[in-house]
């Protein structure tokens, strides 16, 4: 099959799509309007695997050549080149066509805010209660990554899909309304100051209405009921479904609590499962707390400026920073503030580290150790810098500011490597 990846994506979402089809022996081309340099080094890896890369514009011949076009959600459905495509999908519509979908209870999470927290908390709680659960969508996990797991026999009981409102609408239009009937649809919040509640509900897209359970804010419940008609069996407000939530839990847990309650779990089960939720994986995730140190996984920091936002959270504490990785097209100067303030720096190996970070550190006479090929070596070095006699809380922080693909494939694998390395320290 000839597969065209239409739009590589600002966070290289096309990488997972391309790899999925390359691993199956398909012919793959990638087309993007950006220059080759701005796309990063992931495309070099894909090219070595057999993909053909066309940058700085699109060619009609690529669309005529293709049997299947995988469209980036950022590309409008009325794009002129799509008229030449035989078949068009995005990652979610392609996944929905798989027969395994009928074996999985899907929970869709959308809204203007709290999507990532709600999705991650639901995934954690369901797994904690013994129900195998995966998640994909907006948090950076492509549905093609999920399909790879299915191909290997790892089919979950539940799948959490985090969707932006425009992705939900895009997927609905792609499928011409024939979307799968999901177990639950969660609308976490609505846009501020909509003209009417009907408008707010409409913005969330009809994809959300084909569900056994719809859980939404009380302010749009009536509008959602009107829109859903007979498509949903049970529409509940977050507020009404979460009244028994433990007062020890933060208010942001009301959304996942309400969903789990409507799915039939007891209050005691839900409260216990959510109590152990430490935060969104790979985003300032607390991995370990000792008497005088915190180990934080911020592996989703894939651009230099993101490191500053994370380090600023701990500005009053000594931060032992683990950073670096792939993609030499990035400008390391954006994280110079954090490099200067760090109590110590342990570098992870990669093209960004070698070509950008190390020269910047040397230019500014900032000490560092590494680069380390293995995460456990970087974690071990950072931990050795902790002052065991200090009464001040210290932080060992993985915040790479770079792509993980050369050594880890994606930021989630990199985060797992960090967590495993930390767990080895306390054995």
Where does each model-flagged region fall?
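Residue-level signal for inorganic ion chemistry
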Residues: 21, 69, 109, 138, ...
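Short internal beta-strands
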Residues: 26-34, 189, 214-218, 320-324, ...
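Phosphate-binding loop of NTP-binding sites
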Residues: 61-66, 73-233, 380, 417-427
């Amino acid at each position: 099959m000839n597969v065209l990846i239409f739009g590589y994506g600002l966070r290289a979402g096309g990488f997972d799509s391309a790899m999925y089809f390359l691993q199956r022996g398909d012919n793959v081309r990638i087309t993007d309007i950006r220059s080759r340099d701005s796309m990063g080094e992931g495309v070099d890896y894909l090219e070595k695997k057999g993909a053909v890369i066309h940058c700085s514009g699109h060619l009609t011949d690529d669309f005529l050549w293709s049997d299947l076009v995988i469209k980036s959600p950022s590309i409008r459905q009325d794009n002129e080149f799509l008229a030449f495509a035989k078949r068009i999908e995005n990652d979610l519509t392609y996944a929905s066509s798989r027969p395994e979908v009928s074996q999985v209870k899907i929970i869709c999470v959308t809204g203007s805010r709290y999507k990532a927290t709600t999705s991650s908390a639901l995934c954690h709680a369901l797994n904690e209660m013994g129900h195998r659960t995966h998640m994909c969508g907006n948090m950076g996990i492509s549905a093609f990554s999920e399909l790879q797991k299915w191909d290997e026999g790892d089919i979950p009981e539940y799948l959490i899909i985090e969707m932006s409102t425009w992705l939900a609408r895009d997927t609905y239009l792609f499928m011409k309304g024939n979307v799968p009937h999901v177990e639950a649809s969660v609308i976490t919040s609505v846009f501020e100051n909509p003209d009417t509640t009907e408008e707010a509900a409409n913005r969330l897209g009809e994809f959300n209405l084909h569900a056994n359970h719809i859980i939404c804010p009380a302010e749009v419940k009536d509008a959602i009921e009107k829109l859903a008609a007979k498509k949903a069996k049970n529409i509940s407000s977050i507020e009404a479904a979460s009244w028994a939530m433990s007062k020890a839990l933060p208010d942001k847990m009301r959304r996942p609590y309400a969903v789990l309650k409507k799915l039939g779990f007891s209050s005691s089960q839900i409260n216990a499962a959510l109590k152990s939720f430490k935060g969104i994986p790979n985003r300032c995730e607390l991995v370990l707390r000792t008497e005088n140190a915190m180990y934080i996984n911020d592996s989703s920091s894939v651009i230099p400026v993101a490191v500053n936002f994370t380090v600023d959270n701990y500005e009053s504490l000594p931060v032992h920073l683990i950073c670096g990785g792939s993609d030499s097209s990035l400008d390391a100067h954006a994280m110079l503030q954090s490099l200067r303030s760090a109590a110590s720096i342990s570098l992870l190996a990669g093209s960004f580290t070698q070509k950008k970070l190390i020269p910047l550190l040397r230019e500014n006479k900032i000490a560092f150790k590494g680069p380390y090929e293995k995460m456990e070596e970087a974690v071990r070095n950072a931990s050795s810098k902790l002052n065991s006699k200090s009464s001040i809380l210290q932080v060992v922080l993985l915040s790479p500011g770079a792509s993980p693909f050369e050594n880890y494939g994606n930021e989630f694998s990199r985060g797992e490597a960090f967590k495993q390395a930390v767990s080895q320290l306390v054995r």
